[in-house]
């Protein structure tokens, strides 16, 4: 069973990043212009996938899906190489894809390492290139399943804390965690009002979170980033929620610029703020995180 069930358009696997074996390309939904336009960035090489990740064609959990699908594409690219050259080619692909975004590079390395390990096992056992390509594509889908199941469960945990008839303020686009709590709200028949802070400069809140919430049937209002404290003072917001790019082992939360001021305002007005995510053992403290 796929874990993107009952989620909106933007979170369906094929609409995040998808490797087409017949065409030999990875399609990535261009979130920079969605929902005004539904266009896909077509990548014919793993280098183009890495560039798309670096250029913010996709974000949040999107780069993880793109990296895994990019490894399948790399296997397609190098299918006519000698065994030794094929392995080196895949190692280069794993490095390029995992280091496309500095802030999440350590987490991305786990994605490409899994793909590379599978590749090494298959090639060692004498698998044909078409079998390798298919296996890496399926592995990318399975990695999606694992990530979606974990993150939507975290989102569901937040949803269970929110009473019926509440209003929430979101920031940026927490992707699968957002999908998780929205889906859980629907499953438990809760009537929730969603305020989406626009989140400059890419407007992920206005374009992505708001589109997903509306797509899934919620009463959704986009607000400018400088309206947040006013709405809090007018008691129009009951809960604040965002994702977290990195949570270090000392409890520090690193996220989109602007998160701190929302958290401070929420604290001032006595509004619960939930940053959804998981501690990253690669970072002991916030000082070790490279900020883009």
Regions found by a protein language model. Give the residues of each.
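Long amphipathic alpha-helical segments
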Residues: 6-127
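Glycine/charged-rich beta-loop-alpha catalytic/anionic-binding loops adjacent to active sites
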Residues: 32-35, 40, 44-54, 135-141, ...
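Short, glycine-rich nucleotide/cofactor-binding loops
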Residues: 40-46, 78, 167-175, 249-254
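Gly/Ser/Thr-rich loops at beta-strand to alpha-helix junctions
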Residues: 61-63, 168, 172-178, 201-202
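Ligand-binding beta-strand-loop-alpha-helix segment within the catalytic cores
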Residues: 109-164, 190-192, 196-240
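Histidine-anchored nucleotide/phosphate-binding helix
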Residues: 178-187, 263
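Conserved phosphate- and dinucleotide-binding cores of soluble alpha/beta proteins
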Residues: 199-292
């Amino acid at each position: 069973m796929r874990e993107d069930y009952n989620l909106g358009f933007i979170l369906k696997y094929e609409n995040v990043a998808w490797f087409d074996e017949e065409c030999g390309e990875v399609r990535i939904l261009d979130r920079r212009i969605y929902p005004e336009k539904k266009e896909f960035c077509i990548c014919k090489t793993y280098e183009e996938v890495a560039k798309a990740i670096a250029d913010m064609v996709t974000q949040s959990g999107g780069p993880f899906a793109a990296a895994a699908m990019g490894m399948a594409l790399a296997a397609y690219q190098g299918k006519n190489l000698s065994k030794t050259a094929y392995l080196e080619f895949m190692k280069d692909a794993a490095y390029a894809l995992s280091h496309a975004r500095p802030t999440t590079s350590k987490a991305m390395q786990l994605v490409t390492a899994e793909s590379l390990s599978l590749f090494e096992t298959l090639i060692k056992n004498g698998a044909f290139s078409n079998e390798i390509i298919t296996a890496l594509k399926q592995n990318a889908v399975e990695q999606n399943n694992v990530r979606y199941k974990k993150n939507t469960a975290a989102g569901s945990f937040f949803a269970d804390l929110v009473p019926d008839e509440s209003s929430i303020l979101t920031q940026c686009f927490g992707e699968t965690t957002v999908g998780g709590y929205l889906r859980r709200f629907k499953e438990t028949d809760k009537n929730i009002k969603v305020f989406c802070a626009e989140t400059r400069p890419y407007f992920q809140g206005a374009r992505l979170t708001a589109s997903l919430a509306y797509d899934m049937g919620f009463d959704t209002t986009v607000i400018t980033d400088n309206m947040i404290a006013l709405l809090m003072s007018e008691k129009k917001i009951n809960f604040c929620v965002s994702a977290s790019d990195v949570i270090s082992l000392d409890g520090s939360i690193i996220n989109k610029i602007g998160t701190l001021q929302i958290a401070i305002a929420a604290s001032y007005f006595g509004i619960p703020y939930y940053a959804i995510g998981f501690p990253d053992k690669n970072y002991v403290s916030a000082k070790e995180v490279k900020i883009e």
